[in-house]
């Protein structure tokens, strides 16, 4: 081998090494950019993704900040009071603690005492949970009202 081919081989190795370093740097930069983007998405979505909290999980900060959240549990028996045309006051409980809920609007068909609910809303200055939306939960034996009516009609016709 002559001296010229050794120099070419050495310079080729240097060039390949530089390209590898450059490629590695680009990959690391892309990973860093994706990590920052993912962090920003998670940070922005932290309030949008709202799982419900049970009354015993409510903190003093939740009450003082008044930020929107979901309160979940059961409608405490004997606490439902209707106020005016579309207002209702009731307590949501998890059998450890309860929170007073004030709601003004149409109630879901499944809403009743002892039934599971998720109430979207916020705490006011007095510490009452002001509901803006109520989602009534049902158990595994739930059947829509229309289905029950059809079954009753069908059953009474057959007899």
From Swiss-Prot:
Pfam families: CcmE (PF03100). Keywords: Cell inner membrane, Cell membrane, Cytochrome c-type biogenesis, Heme, Iron, Membrane, Metal-binding, Signal-anchor, Transmembrane, Transmembrane helix. It is found in: Cell inner membrane. Its main location: membrane. GO terms for molecular function: heme binding; metal ion binding. Heme binds at residues 138, 142. One of its GO terms (biological process) is cytochrome complex assembly. Coiled coil: none annotated. Gene3D superfamilies: Nucleic acid-binding proteins (2.40.50.140). InterPro entries: CcmE, CcmE-like_sf, NA-bd_OB-fold. It is a single-pass type II membrane protein. The chain crosses the membrane at residues 24-44. Residues 45-159 are periplasmic. GO terms for cellular component: plasma membrane. Residues 1-23 are cytoplasmic. It comes from the Bacteria. PANTHER family: CYTOCHROME C-TYPE BIOGENESIS PROTEIN CCME HOMOLOG, MITOCHONDRIAL. Belongs to the CcmE/CycJ family. Heme chaperone required for the biogenesis of c-type cytochromes. Transiently binds heme delivered by CcmC and transfers the heme to apo-cytochromes in a process facilitated by CcmF and CcmH. This is Cytochrome c-type biogenesis protein CcmE.
């Amino acid at each position: 081998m002559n001296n010229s081919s050794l120099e070419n081989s050495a310079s080729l190795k240097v060039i390949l090494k530089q390209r590898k370093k450059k490629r590695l740097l680009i990959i690391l930069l892309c990973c860093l950019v994706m990590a920052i983007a993912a962090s920003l998405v998670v940070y922005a979505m932290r309030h949008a993704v709202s799982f419900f909290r049970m009354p015993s999980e409510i903190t003093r900060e939740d009450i003082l900040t008044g930020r929107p959240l979901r309160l979940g549990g059961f409608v405490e028996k004997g606490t439902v009071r209707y106020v005016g045309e579309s207002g209702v006051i009731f307590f949501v409980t998890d059998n450890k603690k309860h929170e007073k809920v004030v709601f003004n609007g149409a109630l879901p068909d499944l809403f009743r005492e002892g039934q599971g609910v998720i109430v979207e809303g916020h705490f006011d200055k007095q510490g009452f949970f002001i509901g803006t939306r109520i989602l009534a939960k049902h158990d595994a034996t739930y059947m829509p009202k229309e289905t029950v009516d059809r079954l009753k009609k069908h059953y009474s016709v057959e007899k």
